[in-house]
Amino acid sequence: MPILVDESYLAKPLGEAIVKSIHGSHKKVLVIGSTDLTHYPSYENAKKVDQDAVEAILSLEPEKIDDMNKHWLGKGIPNLHCTICSEAAVKTVMRIAKSLGADTAVLLKAANSGDVSIGYKDEVVGYAAIALVQEAS
């Protein structure tokens, strides 16, 4: 079931409601969150900001996204519109995953639109694929 969320303050209550629904279903569930990372900085700036955004997500601590945002958005980087396009979606999925037992985040791939052979490097969009999982004990 697709759910769109655009306000960070909804991450906690939405995550809690989804976890409650998952527990009540007694089914195996895969939760997927989707968003872009940086929007429109230069290639080099995007690499730095995206790396920090990825590290914040890998921490499994949604608050680190807020700290990372304050740091980068306060620097006045030209054309940097956001560090994580839908931070609300990311925070919601982080909360769901942790509530369901995720204790590890694994970076699968990170890149930006400037990485393709015909990629324009003056203004790029960042991307990453990250799995939030429970390590086998």
Features from the language model and the residues they span:
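Flexible, D/E/H-enriched segments
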Residues: 1-30, 40-137
